[in-house]
Amino acid sequence: MSEITKEQVVDFIANMTVLELSQFIKELEEKFGVSAAAPAMGMMMAAPAAGEAAPAEEEKTEFDVILTNAGGNKIAVIKVVRALTGLGLKEAKAKVDELPSSIKEAVSKAEAEDAKKQLEESGATCEIK
């Protein structure tokens, strides 16, 4: 059996599509029981100092972009969905046709707002949850 080098693994991962990479990360999380979320928030959200009350509600760090209406120019919306998700034409068209549909899941606020802006510029209506 030949040895696979770290460089070969990195090259293989670098050639994956966004969708393939997302699925790969989820499989790794499940297999090893870990999370790919940044650990810095956990350290910052450590137990409050004596006398301080814990915040009533934690600030949301992961957002979903939900397409609610494709608008009049479905072709432009499909192109944006493909660019954002890395999906093929058939899969992107299915997301645009089957509303509401999740376009991006568990992304940062900035990434969610950027995706929403791109979708709205193409004529779609979407929301961030």
From Swiss-Prot:
Checking PANTHER family in the record gives: 39S RIBOSOMAL PROTEIN L12, LARGE RIBOSOMAL SUBUNIT PROTEIN BL12M
Protein name (Swiss-Prot/TrEMBL)? Large ribosomal subunit protein bL12
Q: Which organism is it from?
A: Solidesulfovibrio magneticus (strain ATCC 700980 / DSM 13731 / RS-1)
Relate the assembly described in the record: Homodimer. Part of the ribosomal stalk of the 50S ribosomal subunit. Forms a multimeric L10(L12)X complex, where L10 forms an elongated spine to which 2 to 4 L12 dimers bind in a sequential fashion. Binds GTP-bound translation factors.
- Please give the Pfam families that the UniProt record associates with this protein: Ribosomal_L12, Ribosomal_L12_N
Biological process according to GO: translation
CDD domains for the chain: Ribosomal_L7_L12
Q: Does the keyword ATP-binding apply?
A: no
Query: Which superkingdom heads the taxonomic lineage of this protein's source?
Result: Bacteria
